[in-house]
Amino acid sequence: MDSTPYNIILLAGGTAPTLTDGTGVDEKASLTIHDQPMLQWVVNAFHHSPEAGNIVVVGSDNLDKLRCMQYVRKRITQGLSVVQNLLHAVGYVKARFYKGEPDHQGYIISFGDTVFLTPEIVTDTLRAIREADADIVLHYVERQTFVEAGLPAERTYIPIGGKEYTGTGIYYVRKFSKVFSSLNELVEMRKQRKDPKGILRVIGCEGEDFPAIEAALSARLDAKVRILISPHAGMGMDVDKPADYRLARKILPSPDTDEL
């Protein structure tokens, strides 16, 4: 099994007026928690994981002034859509790090607002992805995981196999050529992560269990799809609305100023 650290793509573009209005920043990724920009929390989590290698960020040149960018190999200017951003980032990683070779390790994709990730969560997750040995790996977190962690469980869940799950902020794709025709569907799954009916409609497996969903997605994408259940509540959390931002400021520790 290849043990080379994964190349990481962080999608950090876009604005969120409900979060940034009155803060003096235009972009969500620059919004601070304990005086540290959200993107810096995310870069820190990946930078300090032995399973993560090169980090590529997609976002505007406003991000260049952030201290964490010294640990980013390349910033790619955001395009007009998530699909375009992904294609630009994947194209860069394939050309720069994989030298255009068809056989490579694939791509880890995350987001500039996944501030609840830690190096430990990233390491466990990327090791699980490595062991899954699949073309596409998705993670979900069960509702009970939030309860046991003492975190608010009032979020949107997807009913699967008699339990309730929510999506996460780390995805793996081995080869985008295999999923290019269905890339819009994958993006739609991310977009619909807060809407159980919406994501089940995209998946097309309402009421089924995870093995059935894996089989359906594998057949649809002509790729080996694995769905893993993460034991980490932080995997199922991001900063998408003001309540998330308040929670982040409440539970995230004040960072060590020398951490990065």
Question: Which stretches of residues belong to each language-model region?
Answer:
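N-terminal nucleotide-binding beta1-loop-alpha1 segment
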Residues: 1-24
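Conserved N-terminal catalytic core of the sugar/cofactor nucleotidyltransferase
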Residues: 3-7, 36-105
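Short, well-formed alpha-helical segments that are part of the catalytic scaffolds
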Residues: 17-48
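Short aromatic-hydrophobic micro-motifs that form the base-stacking/packing surface
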Residues: 106-110
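The conserved acidic donor/metal-binding loop of glycosyltransferases
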Residues: 112-115
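Conserved core of the sugar-phosphate nucleotidyltransferase
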Residues: 118-219, 230-233
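Conserved active-site beta-strand element of glycosyltransferases/polysaccharide synthases
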Residues: 226-229, 238
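Short, conserved phosphate/pyrophosphate- and ester-handling motifs at nucleotide-, phospho-/glycolipid
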Residues: 241
